[in-house]
Amino acid sequence: MRYADGMRWTGLGSLVLVTVLAAACSPPPPVPYQQQIQNQRAAKDAAFASDSPESPVPAADRARLLPLAYFPIDEGYHVPARLAPAPGEVALEMPTSTGQRRKMRRAGQLRFSVKGQPLTLTAFVEESDQVMQRLFVPFADASNGTETYIGGRYLDLDRTTTGLYDLDFNRAYQPYCVYNPQYDCPYPPRENRLATPIRSGERLRP
């Protein structure tokens, strides 16, 4: 009987051990979308507030400019997009905040809808980027000059092989020249000026 009891408890212990090991080896649950955005924003604030030379915010201006201001997270601005070949000339010299011209190439036109409204934005790559790993999407909208920087905002996208993209305006950010005029910031071209306001992502401090 003792032997049988011992076997019973040994089997139970093994079951518990297997359960614990399975729990330890299983992947963590996915981070909720809103928490992902909040974490990203907190990390950016911490980086900008640091004494790292990578911070675009001068130490004397950090109390005035930080933490960064954002529109409330709105999943209606997190939409799928398809990249289609861009019409017109591929090459473009994009004017910048310091009076220079940045050489760009059109990667294609992103087609998507926000709040039921069909929209398009052209995605660009630096002319020197031959492998086109990252897409640069500068855009202007009706919030510029009042709620957001007058020179527009940016999105960055990892290039996909499918032409399908996850376009998330909650991740839209203002150019570094907002914090420091020494930065050279491209202005969105006419084709990327939206008539509707995009009240999502980074904004000016109220």
Which residues make up each language-model segment?
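Mid-length scaffold segments of soluble, non-membrane domains
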Residues: 85-151
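Acidic, glycine-rich flexible loop segments
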Residues: 137-173
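Bacterial N-terminal signal peptides that target proteins for export
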Residues: 2-16
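N-terminal secretory signal peptides
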Residues: 36-113
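Low-complexity, intrinsically disordered Gly/Pro/Thr-rich segments
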Residues: 172-188
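Bacterial signal peptide processing site
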Residues: 26-28
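C-terminal motif of bacterial Sec signal peptides marking the signal peptidase cleavage site
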Residues: 21-24
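Acidic/polar low-complexity flexible segments
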Residues: 183-206
